Amino acid sequence: MTSAAGRRRSRRPFRRILLAVAFVFVVGILGATFAVTTDTLGAGRLFDRAVAKVERFLAGPVPDRPTIATVRVSPRPATPSPTLPAPEPTSDPAASGPPHTPTPTPTPKPTPKRVPVDVEIAANPEAIFAHQLTKTWCAPASVQMTLAYLGLADISDEFQRKVHGRIREWESKSDSLNGNWGPAAMALALDAYGAPGYEVRAYEGRQEALRDAAVALEATGSPVILLTWRGAHTWVMTGFRANADPAIFPDARISGAYILDPWYPSVSSLWGPSDPPGTFQDDAEMVRNYLRWNRPEGTYPDRDGLFIALVPTVVVKPAD
């Protein structure tokens, strides 16, 4: 006959095994959560990609429909400093014909001076900053920040989810072979929320892209969205520095840009830590991050090997 003490002793190893299994399970869950949250060894990206694939399966095939075309921008001629027009010749008193009043010589305008410029349209970058809610939501976050600067949106998580929830209205296979967000979908989203006129532009050179972005930013007072990390990420450009005003001097060199990076404050295992909103990214950082479009999912004939930007073309009136 088994004693009570013997039964208690026989249960102890079983309880210890259960506790050990429970401990390993909890540690595993916590470790997986930490890995996804911090993107350790790319775990966060893998998790988000898995979720995106499930969403894609549920949504069905990517629609093959027309969308906003990518505009190939020709380089602006690098001319010297602006020159004054030659004055119109006055009438010759000795010339035949009836006398007439001489045409007055126009007053020459002063030649613009070539001086460095520092432009930043976002007075308070933190007030319009929105962190992307998942590893793959940089596009809706950048759309949100652009709209927030224009007074057309807030920076709440709810609004970002709302924007992303409408992606099926705008996605197109030619814009993104994987579906979901491409630059054309971003332009359509901006238009849907009151910021029309954004163009998807492609450039041969980085300086050419940054100059055109700077000119558009000055002319419209609206941010530019740069397609960074070979087209895998987005930065919102709210200003720039240059050795001259690019709107006047076509050969002005852009030395960097003021950026809102929706990835902040996350750290990428490939690209490193991101920077706070409004950070000036100098030339070296632009060379490291703003790279030619090159996507692994397939070819994009009008974008591959080019620098891509989403550029404003019209002045957007602030919302009442």
Predicted regions and their residues:
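Terminal targeting segments of Actinobacterial cell-envelope proteins
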Residues: 1-15
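Conserved active-site-adjacent core of cysteine acyl-enzyme catalytic domains
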Residues: 2, 6, 23-71, 164-320
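Short, hydrophobic alpha-helical membrane anchors of single-pass surface/secreted proteins
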Residues: 15-21
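Ser/Thr-rich, Proline-interspersed low-complexity disordered segments
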Residues: 60-115
